[in-house]
């Protein structure tokens, strides 16, 4: 049976909303990471056969953002590209689809990942084409409406998660403690050079003088503590338990991996980080988020023929602390063992990028350890979940 491998990958540092990457489009960022990933892999753009990129906020981004990024990165005009929108699952699903296409015999070399500029999301004048005869009109925020608002319950996803917390019974303190650990672990990882293998600097032109090199995630606050987070007001409900500190940050960034048929990689004399294993895809029974990563992981490990206890590296995207806490509890994993180098609460959550970011991070972490199983998992809007098993052998 054909096996797919992740040869290597690259990501940008993650910028805060209206932060260092505010002037870059999602495709600009994607092009940077595609070019960097190919260079790191020692793979010529000419042998790439397909490009799959996740992006959620595409209004105003121009036609085919994935193809924009591919062409700008030097991939040929004869190479097709696909833009995926599966909300927060997009970047991971792009990699999973690359694996599926390779195993199906369609391609041998696929570039896959995710890109997002939440800063560049425009405001929309809905129904303007048909005109307005009288009265006020409302301008809709593309970021909020198409990115962060649950269409099934007509409320922000944070409010939906707050409602589910009434059932899950996670306290404000538990969520604050988890969020603080995310910042502390991410800060320590940067200090220890853990992210050096995955992050490519972004050169930011200046009006005068040399370009500025943007090199580190700018949302991490090393001095964050549960005590400092305790002073924040609830974000979604009076007396609620979720605050801006226990929710993921609105951010900009991109991540790309090079996925290849293992035999092709051997023919080219390449090494690789990991083999790609089973993919778990779940949904329902409603649009809530908390259980989706756990459900997807359970499905993926079952398809892989292993147990949760055999997972050495577990990345669960921190859309909210409550999501990671709930999924860890359902899996029987201690929360401190999830996201050992911090997560989206600290580094940020560019919607289309995050699945690719955590997949790349699991791959690199397994490669550092030399063996073992890892999983990258996320919840997604509409009550869906994806998980991808990786193995270093």
UniProtKB/Swiss-Prot annotation:
It comes from the Bacteria. GO terms for molecular function: acetyl-CoA C-acetyltransferase activity. Its EC number is 2.3.1.9. It catalyses: 2 acetyl-CoA = acetoacetyl-CoA + CoA. Pfam families: Thiolase_C (PF02803), Thiolase_N (PF00108). It is an enzyme of class 2 (transferase). The active site is at 88 (acyl-thioester intermediate), 349 (proton acceptor), 379 (proton acceptor). Keywords: Acyltransferase, Transferase. InterPro entries: Thiolase, Thiolase-like, Thiolase_acyl_enz_int_AS, Thiolase_AS, Thiolase_C, Thiolase_CS, Thiolase_N. Belongs to the thiolase-like superfamily. Thiolase family. This is Probable acetyl-CoA acetyltransferase. It comes from Mycobacterium leprae (strain TN).
């Amino acid at each position: 049976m054909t096996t797919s491998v992740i040869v290597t990958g690259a990501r940008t540092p993650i910028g805060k909303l209206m932060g260092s990457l505010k002037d870059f489009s999602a495709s600009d960022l994607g092009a940077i990471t595609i070019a960097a990933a190919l260079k790191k892999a020692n793979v010529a753009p000419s042998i790439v056969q397909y490009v799959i990129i996740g992006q959620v906020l595409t209004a105003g981004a121009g036609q085919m953002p994935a193809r924009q990024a591919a062409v700008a990165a030097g991939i040929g005009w004869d190479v097709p590209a696909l833009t995926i929108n599966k909300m927060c699952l997009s970047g991971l699903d792009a990699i999973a689809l690359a694996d599926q296409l390779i195993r199906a015999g369609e391609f041998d070399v696929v570039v896959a990942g995710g890109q997002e500029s939440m800063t560049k999301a425009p405001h929309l004048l809905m129904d303007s084409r048909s005109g307005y005869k009288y009265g006020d009109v409302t301008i809709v925020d593309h970021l909020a409406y198409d990115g962060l608002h649950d269409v099934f319950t007509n409320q922000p996803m944070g409010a939906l998660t707050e409602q589910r917390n009434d059932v899950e019974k996670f306290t404000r303190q538990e969520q604050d403690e988890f969020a603080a650990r995310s910042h502390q672990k991410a800060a320590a990882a940067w200090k220890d050079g853990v992210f050096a293998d995955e992050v490519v600097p972004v050169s930011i032109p200046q009006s005068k003088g040399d370009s500025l090199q943007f090199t580190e995630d700018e949302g991490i606050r090393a001095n964050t503590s549960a005590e400092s987070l305790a002073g924040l007001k609830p974000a979604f409900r009076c007396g609620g338990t979720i605050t801006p500190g226990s929710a993921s940050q609105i951010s900009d960034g991109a991540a790309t991996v090079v996925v290849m048929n293992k035999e092709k990689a051997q023919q080219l004399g390449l090494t690789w980080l990991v083999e790609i294993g089973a993919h778990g895809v779940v949904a329902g029974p409603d649009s809530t988020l908390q259980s989706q990563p756990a459900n997807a992981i359970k499905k993926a490990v079952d398809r892989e023929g292993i147990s949760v206890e055999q997972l050495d590296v577990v990345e669960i995207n921190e859309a909210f602390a409550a999501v990671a806490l709930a999924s860890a509890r359902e899996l029987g994993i201690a929360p401190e063992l999830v996201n050992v180098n911090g997560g989206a609460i600290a580094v940020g959550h560019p919607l289309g990028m995050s699945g690719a970011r955590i997949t790349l991070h699991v791959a690199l972490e397994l490669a550092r350890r030399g063996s073992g199983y890892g999983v990258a998992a996320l919840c997604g809007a509409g009550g869906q979940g994806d998980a991808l098993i990786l193995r270093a052998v």
